[in-house]
Amino acid sequence: MITPFDLHGALNLDAARSLARWLQDQGNDGLVIAGTTGEAPVLTDDERLSLFAAVIEAVTIPVIAGTGTNDTAHSVHLTKEAAALGAAGVLAVCPYYNRPSQAGIEGHMRAMAAASDLPVMVYDIPVRSGRKISSALLLKLAREVSNVVALKDAAGNPGETAVVIANAPDGFEVYSGDDGLTLPLLASGIVGTVGVATHWTAPDHQEMFGLWDAGDTAGARRVNARIDRKS
């Protein structure tokens, strides 16, 4: 979900509540806040936590709070705060700018997961973070850390996504994090999308997923083409 600001650059919580309710009414099954689209790196802690509280209060669908930063201790703190506010889960982005090793990424993700009992969605977006989370590490976290339960995949490599899905433990869910790859990734077994276009195409996405699940791949392609025209 985008983060609304007013003309003076201040966080607009009334607009955030209204937008969250509208997105729910449009058919979104959950909301991810303070992610990439929500401009998380520009938010102060007070703004981020106020946003969490406002959106959680405004809707009845699950709210996934973006608590990952490039600072492990800071990410742990935000995760604990999100849990106290009632978030349904947290989004843990690969630490950006620092370009950590795979061992460093592992330590960061384990620390975030240990900070609360909330489900953790790992967020792999190398074009912005500067570091790809390896498929081997994604699978290791999925197998060894009980509350690492999902992946938002914005890595742009459908072949690697297919490897993760094929080898992940039962119950581990993979979501598209790239609007342009959502339909192709359905063929590999993703369960949904954490999108940008879903701000205005949620009914279309619901229709596309329904057609795909029903075996109507041609129909799903037609709806995807409609989504592309709107994006």
Predicted features along the sequence, with ranges:
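Active-site pocket-lining segment
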Residues: 199-206
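Acidic/histidine-rich catalytic cores of soluble enzymes
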Residues: 123-124, 141-145, 152-158, 167
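Catalytic cores of alpha/beta
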Residues: 71-84, 161-164, 180-188
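Active-site beta->alpha loop and helix N-cap motifs at the rims of alpha/beta catalytic domains
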Residues: 3-132, 140, 148
